[in-house]
Amino acid sequence: LQSNVSYCLYGSKKHMMERMFQNSSYPFYRFGDLFYLGKISETDWTDFICQRFEITGKHISAQLAQKICRVTDRYSSYVQQLAWLVWLRTDNTATETDLQNGIDQLLDACEPLFIQQTEDLSAYQMNFLHAISNGVNTGFTQSAVLKEYQLGTAANITRLKKALTEKDLITTIAPKTIAMSDPILQMWLKRRVWRE
């Protein structure tokens, strides 16, 4: 047996993690404390990316490092992956072309997972994601939104939110305000599914 041991369980699937620790039917119910960690600041990421490039004899401008942060919405795994992809393509100084090629490579790498996550979604669910991707975060039951995004009836919105939250594709970021859970999935949908 172990004594004086602490465990740290972590993950980015917020809804799943909450269910594991807050639902009495799960084995980790009230297992410990939940901590919601904020994202690393853009300034800290920018400094880190620039320093890591410099250490290896390459250079990336602060502006390009900031773009990496903004494209990935500062999601740690994506920031690191995209920065690495840009670093791989950089001879001496990273360029906008290196960044765009890195983004394409990131989308290519994530595509099989994104196909798997979206292939069984209903047309209404895809339309709901489309609305969110286009900046609709509230007011889904308004007739103009229902019509523009073909979401069905106002009663359908509750079911859509529930189903997509359970799949960890969307998250509530403020009262009655919804966002995509994964910024790269959102980009993939916009660029490669809806061709926007």
Segments (PLM) and residue ranges:
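Short, flexible helix/strand-to-coil boundary loops that buttress conserved ligand/catalytic motifs
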Residues: 20-21, 49, 83, 174, ...
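Small/polar loops that bind or transfer phosphate-bearing groups
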Residues: 8-9, 37, 181
